[in-house]
Amino acid sequence: RPLPEETSRKMIRNEFGGINESFYNLYALTGDERYRWLAGFFYHNDVIDPLKEQRDDLGTKHTNTFIPKVLAEARNYELTGDGDSKALSEFFWHTMIGRHTFAPGCSSDKEHYFDPDEFSKHISGYTGETCCTYNMLKLSRHLFCWEASPEVADYYERALYNHILGQQDPATGMVSYFLPLQSGTHKVYSTPENSFWCCVGSGFESHAKYAESIYYRGEDCLYVNLFIPSELAWKEKGLNLRQETRFPEEETTRLTLALETPRRLAVKLRYPSWSGRPTVRVNGKSVRVKQHPRSYITLDRRWEDGDRIEVTYPMRLAMERMPDNPRKGALLYGPVVLAGVLGTEGMQPPAPYSNPLRYNDYYIYDYHIPQGLPCSLPWDDRHPERVLKRTGKGLTFVTESGVQVLPLYDVHRQRYVVYWDCMEQ
């Protein structure tokens, strides 16, 4: 017997994850209309209707309750061609990335949205729920399959390196629920037997997905979106491609093509928004780059077995200011968010782990932040190299005051600063 409308509306206000997307997937596999009906049953008017009207009504809603409901709409578009579902998914993505996403590619404060652009009021120890970034990456993959957008690929890279990669403790494999952005906080990791948070599930799954969006294919083209050492086998084209790089610790990536027979193919290399003018060589010969950042460099030619492509993307230091407080900003080197390392003073056990004896400890964690941590940075947009000196060891820098600065993904078991107090020089 059908549920009364008020009962069903009350039920779907809760966080039910991706069950509606799962029903759409079952419909795709079976063609059984009952699954499509069930997916539609979980349509949440209060969430989806404002997006249909192109309104940012996110307010203080629970972030990861919201994103899977949009993912279901993206899947609905793919299966039914519903134009409203496509438009609202794209509007939501652009709204999230443009007005609700911090520099590392994460969103939310204490699991909730905040008013558009009001970032400086929400730099807390409870920012950046991992599940939210996991699902935004998932939505990004849907959007890129609809249209090969370098903007979407830029975000994917930013979130993958700065949030997902740095979310796992390299010493134990444990993962963090939040990515704290308050100065002086540290990452808080799960424990092996007592922390079964949602972000443990999505966290572990995320680290099995690094190969998922390196390459995309069109009918006669290949998109190279991420610069990650990898091998691609495209059986239909008789193509094997090998990518070799130490990015982001080096600026160059090298691709070698192995072909059963010569073939014409457009290889599309992402030209990131953060890059200076790239240099491109095919079999050692320079190729003129006419494109602009946030586009694709297209190498459309007849390829032969053993052909080589070498691309160098110049990286530079930059300060990304908060829109509501330009005196606060995050340091980036290329797509990599840099953090100042602030040591371990005041970190009391069970730090850096969650306390299994306290329910939802990650949500009320006391960081015991010491006073007087060096979180200010004299900054000069014209001469950033005067502010930060590279030490020659990977992506390691040091400030004039002696604070070591590393990629955020490399800072573990220590306090850090991501959003600096900027003092203009």
Go through each PLM region and give its residues.
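Asp-box/WD-like beta-propeller blade repeats and closely related beta-sheet repeat scaffolds
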Residues: 1-14
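Long, well-ordered core segments of solenoidal/helical folds
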Residues: 1-4, 34-54, 88-105, 158-169
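Well-ordered alpha-helical segments within folded domains of soluble proteins
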Residues: 11-28, 61-78, 128-144, 200-210, ...
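Structural helix-adjacent loops and short alpha-helical linkers that scaffold large soluble proteins
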Residues: 27-40, 77-90, 97, 143-154, ...
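C-terminal beta-rich recognition modules with glycine/proline-rich loops and embedded aromatic residues
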Residues: 89, 153-162, 167-258, 282, ...
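Flexible glycine/proline-rich, aromatic-decorated loop/lid segments
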Residues: 100-118
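Beta-strand-rich binding/interaction modules
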Residues: 262-282
